[in-house]
């Protein structure tokens, strides 16, 4: 029996914040359903930012965003040990931009559930 394909989710954040957008908050139940369907899930949450600000601050903000999502999942009953978090900061842009460019689609976390 082969393992199921990982499910991928993308959540977006408000400017310079670890608060999810209203639209992204609506996606949380879908993520929880994907996690709870699996006997022993592995969840990877990677935080990202746009290029406003310096790289070090953006790396920290990306981690803060990933930890915020982990907190939402843990509060919903997912074991913390099942969730890995990391930050790419501004290093892995969804939408390529010049430095110091505001781009809401880059303010995100990428979630993989398998």
Name each model-derived stretch.
Residues 46-114:
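Periplasmic OmpA-like peptidoglycan-binding domain that tethers envelope proteins to the cell wall
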Residues 1-42:
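Periplasmic peptidoglycan-binding/tethering modules of Gram-negative envelope proteins
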């Amino acid at each position: 029996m082969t393992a199921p394909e990982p499910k991928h989710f993308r959540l977006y954040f408000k400017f310079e914040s670890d608060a999810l957008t209203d639209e992204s908050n609506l996606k949380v139940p879908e993520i929880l359903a994907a996690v709870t369907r699996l006997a022993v899930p592995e969840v990877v949450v990677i935080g990202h930012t746009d290029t406003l600000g310096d790289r070090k601050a953006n790396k920290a903000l990306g981690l803060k965003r990933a930890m915020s999502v982990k907190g939402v999942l843990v509060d919903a009953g997912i074991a913390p040990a099942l969730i890995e978090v990391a930050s790419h900061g501004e290093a892995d842009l969804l939408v390529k931009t010049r430095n110091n460019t505001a781009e809401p689609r880059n303010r995100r976390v990428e979630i993989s559930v398998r």
